[in-house]
Design a protein with these regions (language model features):
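Juxtamembrane loop-transmembrane helix junctions in multi-pass integral membrane proteins
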Residues: 3-7, 81-84, 133, 249-262, ...
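Alpha-helical transmembrane segments of multi-pass inner-membrane proteins
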Residues: 6-44, 48, 55-130, 134-142, ...
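A membrane-periplasm/extracellular boundary helix in multi-pass inner-membrane enzymes
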Residues: 21, 27-30, 121-199, 213-221, ...
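Short, Lys/Arg-enriched, Gly/Pro-containing loop segments at transmembrane-helix junctions
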Residues: 35-37, 165-168, 341-346
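Long extracytoplasmic/lumenal interhelical loops at the membrane interface
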Residues: 41, 47, 196-263
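Membrane-interface micro-motifs in multi-pass membrane enzymes
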Residues: 54-67, 252-255, 260-264, 317-328
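Transmembrane alpha-helices of multi-pass inner-membrane enzymes
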Residues: 113-121, 297-346
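Short, surface-exposed polybasic-aromatic patches that bind anionic ligands, especially phosphate groups
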Residues: 288
Length: 346
């Protein structure tokens, strides 16, 4: 069974490795393209546009979130694989994914990265030999402090990468023009990475608050069974034309509100019971298992957490056909297998 996951891990890692390389090339060359499409609210965007790196992904939030998952899987192989070449590849891959995340301007991916790192570091510290011998309360405090310090350092690394990379396009242009690179004050320009859609006093939620409020309106109008996944937007146009979704062809950007609008209270209840069960299994495993850094299940659980957090801000996880949905439901199968007492006792 683990071989199937190994194959999946490696394929995902390799694919995202080359995706990151191509995306970074688009940033360094300042390539960007925008194609209007009749069936989309936003045009198809690729490359560097709007002061953020879309790269090969039409939506950088989705791409950068999977970059976090790929970082987790690369760490897993660094810890468990003795092949030096493969270790070097995964180390380089982690750097490339961090570079893409820093340039993507995805606040969702940054929240996901910091949260998953904090949770992962908490449990690693919790089971470490230095902390394991302490009293339970002190053990928790030291683990939390370790998590906070780790994400503080990680945030500084992301910020440093973002600042450093912003000068590379200018350096490449200077090299192509055969300009002297010594006079950096006059020739070296920094690429602006401040998103105009959320900076300068813009909507901090980027329309999410309006979308969530509109999803609640749909839920209230059909609270038991919802308006269906494929029909809640047309339903809003017909039944609630004054609502935000009724006036725009936009999705809910939150899996909870998507379930509410699409399946109503019945679907929300079923999913809530299912998800609480998976949370219980995961926490039981994480608190009961030591040597987590070499444990595949540890990284699977963190990957599920990563995509779940992202689904609080983008349309992901349920009732969609995305790479994130494929990853999380595949990994949830792995978590479900942990219910077996034999798996928990290993």
């Amino acid at each position: 069974k683990d071989k199937i996951f190994d194959y999946f891990f490696v394929i995902l890692i390799i694919f995202w490795f080359f995706s990151a390389i191509i995306s970074l090339w688009m940033f360094f060359t300042q390539f960007g393209v925008k194609i209007p499409m009749d069936n989309r609210y936003y045009p198809l965007r690729m490359g560097f546009l709007g002061n953020r790196l879309f790269g090969v992904f039409p939506d950088p939030n989705f791409g950068a979130t999977i970059s976090v998952v790929v970082i987790l899987l690369s760490v897993y192989y660094i810890k468990t694989n003795s092949n030096r070449a493969f270790t070097l590849f995964n180390s380089l891959n982690i750097l490339l994914q961090l570079m893409f995340i820093s340039l993507s301007g995805s606040r969702t991916a940054l929240i996901v990265l910091l949260t998953v790192t904090a949770v992962g570091m908490f449990f690693v510290s919790y089971h470490s030999k230095k902390i394991d011998s302490q009293k339970l309360f002190l053990r928790w405090i030291l683990s939390i402090i370790s998590s906070l310090l780790t994400i503080a350092v990680l945030y500084l690394i992301i910020d440093a990468l973002k600042t450093g990379l912003s000068y590379i396009p200018s350096l490449l242009q200077m090299k192509e023009a055969s300009l002297p690179t010594i006079d950096t004050k006059n020739n070296l320009n920094k690429v602006n990475l401040d998103r105009p859609d959320v900076s300068n006093g813009g909507d901090i939620s980027n329309l999410r608050f309006s979308l969530w409020s509109s999803a609640v309106e749909i839920f209230k109008s059909s609270w038991l069974v919802g308006a269906s996944a494929a029909n809640y937007i047309p339903y809003a146009h017909d039944v609630l034309p004054d609502s935000f979704i009724g006036q725009n062809t936009l999705t809910t950007h939150n899996f909870v509100f998507l379930i509410m609008a699409s399946t109503g209270a019945s679907g929300l209840l079923v999913f809530f019971i299912f998800f609480v069960n998976k949370i219980y299994i995961s926490l039981k495993y994480l608190f009961g298992k030591s040597s987590l850094m070499q444990d595949m299940n540890f990284y699977v659980i963190l990957s599920v957490l990563a995509i779940t957090i992202s689904a609080l801000f983008i349309t992901e996880l349920v009732l969609v056909s995305t790479i994130g949905a494929v990853v999380i439901w595949f990994f949830l199968g792995k978590i479900t297998s942990l219910e077996n007492k034999d798996s928990l006792s290993k």
